[in-house]
Amino acid sequence: MYAVFMSGGKQYRVKKNQIIQLEKLNNSPGSIIEFDKILMISAKKEVKIGEPFLKGTKIKAHVENHGRLKKIKIIKFNRRKHYKKKQGHRQYFTNVKILDINNFNGK
């Protein structure tokens, strides 16, 4: 069984007990969270697709930890104008473990 849900403007395909990396969530490590914007659920040969979301369906997850990704460098440069701008960015993330995919509408 797998599900597709939306978090932080992105879509993620998950299975039970899978650990995924999401955009930063404002939940403390060790807390349990629920995602209710479920786009699709597939169980064996049965597929349910939401319009746009499935009602009565939730994904339960455990917040493992927070962190930051590797630094990326941004460089702007104009030749012959003596202009060079260098900038860096480190994106925050949250690791989440999927505990359960609940489908209250059906089996």
Swiss-Prot record:
One of its GO terms (cellular component) is ribonucleoprotein complex. PROSITE patterns: RIBOSOMAL_L21. GO terms for biological process: translation. GO terms for molecular function: rRNA binding; structural constituent of ribosome. HAMAP family: Ribosomal_bL21. Belongs to the bacterial ribosomal protein bL21 family. This is Large ribosomal subunit protein bL21. It comes from Buchnera aphidicola subsp. Schizaphis graminum (strain Sg).
